[in-house]
Amino acid sequence: MVNNILKAPEGPPSDVEEIKEKSDYLRGTLKEVMLDRISAGIPDDDNRLMKHHGSYLQDDRDLRNERQKQKLEPAYQFMLRVRMPGGVSTPEQWLVMDELAQKYGNNTLKLTTRETFQMHGILKWNMKKTIQKINAALLDTIAACGDVNRNVMCASNPHQSEIHAEVYEWSKKLSDDLLPRTRAYHEIWLDEERVAGTPDTETEPMYGPLYLPRKFKIGIAVPPSNDIDVYSQDLGFIAIVEEGRLIGFNVAIGGGMGMTHGDTATYPQLSKVIGFCKPEQLYDVAEKTITIQRDYGNRSVRKNARFKYTVDRLGLENVKAELENRLGWQLDEAKPYHFDHNGDRYGWVKGVKGKWHFTMFIEGGRVTDYENYKLMTGLREIAKVHTGDFRLTSNQNLIIGNVSSQKKKQISALIEQYGLTDGRQHSALRRSSMACVALPTCGLAMAEAERYLPKLIDKIEDIVDENGLRDEEITIRMTGCPNGCARHALGEIGFIGKAPGKYNMYLGAAFDGSRLSKMYRENIGEEEILSELRTILPRYAKEREEGEHFGDFVIRAGIIKATTDGTNFHE
């Protein structure tokens, strides 16, 4: 029921809304076009629907100009993303993903900033068999992309405490219960026969035939770690623990990182805490929040369609009142909590029940075999003997989790044999870095990110070392476009691609993920970046207060103005 007080924005529906409306619940003509061998690509309308099945059509942009000269179509390929709530994979599932990446992908796995696997380079005629093998491993790609609830994140290591384990179970339940109900995925990819005559109301009781105006992201944090950047989520839950027992969750709404260059009506935003719910109320809060976005989100202008804009347009208190109206009960007052950081903690740690966990540093989240670093092979060999699990972190790293005391020696030997690392030989800056895929596969990228950030850090490390800052954690993030997949606006140093070799530089985000950055320099190249840091980092080394983080220092020192809300991000 739509509230008469709150108003949905006016305007004609976007072309994507029309595509969804005509799609027969995300079917479109995908089944037919995937059989077509004339082109390696698919029509744009079907590509818009393909997202909801966990995939995007891409092309190798390194080859684009040469193929145009040869009058060939782009080197089309598909990216495939797995739905994996909380980032948990069994060793058997890891081996399946490893095999598929070698057989059908580009011999790499990307560990994403939302705790899941991405595979790149899959050809159209290999898509169905790849998806079928993923499903046979008890994983899937449903709703990993698209205008639905995406992969539900949670604090990375559920086995470090009973609380983490409990929170992980809630993330799985949310992910499963908020899935689209259409059987399109199963019919197109898994050869399920369609059941005729299913009433529309039963097809998508929560989403409806148009699904959501844009993607929707949920994450659960366990203080004092904000590793999932809970304030960046459309809907964030903050676990509240009293006397070692999970009593419920603070509820935060309206976060999101994406924006559009040059359009100040778009901006990153942090969610705001509006109250507290008990664990058994979690799903009800999530479902009702999603239906508010379904009913009031902007379906006319997609760049203003995320839930953060809905909240800012309608007003936080009005959205809270509407949520409580739909719930039929009021949220309790938010409980106190505290975050220390939003990064990972590396190396071996002993958890509950005598189990061990090794958090390893994987630069850019890219699992592959390098010339002198057989990372993919090493992890494959560990997966063959490991009896615990793997945990993909929201900082693109990996936890070899739930290792028994009996297995620890064997796994430690493999870690040493293949040179797998907890990052201690790297600077804390590098260990705190994150980059999206960007070029050559992402169609939105305006500049390099994953391929370039390590090289830039090589040069920044010289400045860091000169100033005694090698062990100082400074979060640094780079994205190839303003969409924010690597949560650039929450990096103490952030870069957003503007053009090849050119970036907007941002400073001043909080180390615990509670404050956005602000643009410091626009459209600058490497020399200008390094020149700025040669000025700022020595000042930080000399003038900082005890325990003061870089993002706080640049504000106190007057180098950058604090961003107090996403609505003044561009000021």
UniProtKB/Swiss-Prot annotation:
Q: What biological process terms from GO does the record include?
A: cysteine biosynthetic process; hydrogen sulfide biosynthetic process; sulfate assimilation
Q: Where does [4Fe-4S] cluster bind?
A: 436, 442, 481, 485
What are the GO cellular component annotations?
A: sulfite reductase complex (NADPH)
Keywords associated with the record: 4Fe-4S, Amino-acid biosynthesis, Cysteine biosynthesis, Heme, Iron, Iron-sulfur, Metal-binding, NADP, Oxidoreductase
Tell me which cofactor or cofactors this protein depends on.
siroheme; [4Fe-4S] cluster
Query: According to its UniProt record, in which pathway does this protein act?
Result: Sulfur metabolism; hydrogen sulfide biosynthesis; hydrogen sulfide from sulfite (NADPH route): step 1/1
Its signal peptide is: none
Which domain of life does this protein belong to? Bacteria
Q: What is the E.C. number?
A: 1.8.1.2
Name the Gene Ontology molecular function terms of this record: 4 iron, 4 sulfur cluster binding; heme binding; metal ion binding; NADP binding; sulfite reductase (ferredoxin) activity; sulfite reductase (NADPH) activity
Q: Which reaction does it catalyse?
A: hydrogen sulfide + 3 NADP(+) + 3 H2O = sulfite + 3 NADPH + 4 H(+)
Q: What PROSITE patterns does this protein map onto? A: NIR_SIR
SUPFAM superfamilies per UniProt: Nitrite and sulphite reductase 4Fe-4S domain-like (SSF56014), Nitrite/Sulfite reductase N-terminal domain-like (SSF55124)
Q: How does it assemble?
A: Alpha(8)-beta(8). The alpha component is a flavoprotein, the beta component is a hemoprotein.
Give the family from UniProt.
Belongs to the nitrite and sulfite reductase 4Fe-4S domain family.
Q: Main role?
A: Component of the sulfite reductase complex that catalyzes the 6-electron reduction of sulfite to sulfide. This is one of several activities required for the biosynthesis of L-cysteine from sulfate.
What's the protein here called?
Sulfite reductase [NADPH] hemoprotein beta-component
Q: Specify the species.
A: Bacillus velezensis (strain DSM 23117 / BGSC 10A6 / LMG 26770 / FZB42) (Bacillus amyloliquefaciens subsp. plantarum)
